[in-house]
Amino acid sequence: MLTTVLGPEGYAAMLAGNPAGAVWAVDHGDYAPDSVEYTCVAGVVLRRDLPLDQWRGIYGDVDGLLAAGVLEASPTDATRAHITVDIRPVAARGTESAEVLIVSDQDSSMTARTPAPNHVPGVGNAPLSLLSVLPPVSDAQRAGSPPLRVLDLGTGSGVLATVLATSHSAVEVTATDISSRALGFARCAFPQHASIDWVEGSWFEPVEGQLFDLIVSNPPFVIGPDCGLSYRETPLDFDGASRLVVEQAAQHLANHGTAHLLAAWALTEADSAASKVTGWIPGEDIRAWVVQRDLVDITTYVHTWLTDEGIDTRSSEGIKRTADWLDYFMGAGITHIGMGYVHMKRTTGTSSEVTFEVMDQALQPGTFLGHETREWFARAEWLDRQDAHSVLDTQYAARPTLALEHVSVSDGDLGVGFKDYALRLSRTDGPAWSHEVDQHVAAIVKGINPDGLTLRDTAELYAAVNGLDGDAFTDALAPIVVDLVRHGLILPADIVEEL
């Protein structure tokens, strides 16, 4: 409904925290001011004062809402009112499930306000970001299996728990939070849903000894000098909250279970982000994919989160808060903050394997990476079973969305024309991975066929035709192909049907 009523520009304005632009879009849209659609968007989402008759059009009798403070009468006109809570629709990505409504406190995106210490956030960028990387689970995949046991740690207003519970028929969700107020909001979204157990408690204490098939968490990972806002900050120093969640989530995974977590890591000049996060992951029985989406300097980080809190960093309060926060970082030598996802899968009888990758390339707006997350583990498990010989003795398929890019730049030496600069294999879908290759690798990828020759036969034939040493060529090719498979540019024929 939001995109329909607001249109693309109005919807973008809403997401950017530009209420004036969003209001203009709805006022100049196709829906009359007395329509239900207009009331839902202008009144509920954009928080405009509207006549009580319009509120009755969507809520019926509004006396109870006024008495409870959900609606508040305008101070200048008792026949008009505005909403005091946030109600947003959200749906699972990668499925055709219906939207659910999430109820929470209002943030500062549409109206000027500073969140209270017990503020309960709603459908914001963090849960939407995590939903965009969660692998979809279809009922067909679960047919004949026990219900999927899901833990939403630190559920807040229940975005992740409610979406997961309503997306599939065979799930049992445990949703925990330290805040009883947050759980009260969460129950509003789907109070009668039998498959959600709302539990109050700190971190993993409410689920001690329990194992889950799926763990999701958008924990309070903001790194700051105090814990004034419980929804985003904790008493744990620096990245202690992220570390705790990663370490303990691994302990609560059932065999083959997966965890998908938002996390942040504080870095000094001497720190390696890969080494730091790898140190949080147990040494046995875990395969992990850590994806760093952002790396920001501490000045940018502090400004971002003070603005999120509704603090004007130009004000005297904002200037003091900024200085205190930066002093906190500099006292520990912290210069940058990394943020991203930690994906883990429980294995058995193996040493843990951690892959850390930087995914800072621009992606298409709305890109859904849930399928990529699931496929990454399938590709990693396939690679784990191979050696250099079996990699060469396999047939491969080029990904349907694979592009071969020829990059030329102006020829400064001649002063005219262009000269070859780079040759790249790039995915035009999902994470948009791109690998620079030479003409030999490009030629081999052009020649692979899932029903044709093995990679070894293709490479040896190419080497013979082009006067290359066959053994040296295939030996050099194997690790390159491993990297191409890891990023899904080419796929082993024997797992294509599984993906």
For the regions a protein language model found, what residue spans apply to each?
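Mobile active-site "lid"/loop adjacent to the S-adenosyl-L-methionine
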Residues: 180, 217-244
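Conserved SAM/SAH cofactor-binding pocket of Class I
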Residues: 124-217, 223
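SAM-dependent Rossmann-like transferase core, predominantly class I methyltransferases
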Residues: 74-150, 157-159, 163-166
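Short beta-strand micro-motifs in enzyme catalytic cores
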Residues: 100, 338-342, 421
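Long, charge-rich, low-complexity alpha-helical segments
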Residues: 34-86, 131, 135, 140-146, ...
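Acidic, low-complexity/disordered tracts enriched in E/D and polar residues
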Residues: 1-40, 110, 349-446, 491-499
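Flexible, glycine-/basic-rich loop-and-beta segments that form/coincide
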Residues: 298-377
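Conserved Class I SAM-dependent methyltransferase catalytic core
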Residues: 238-292
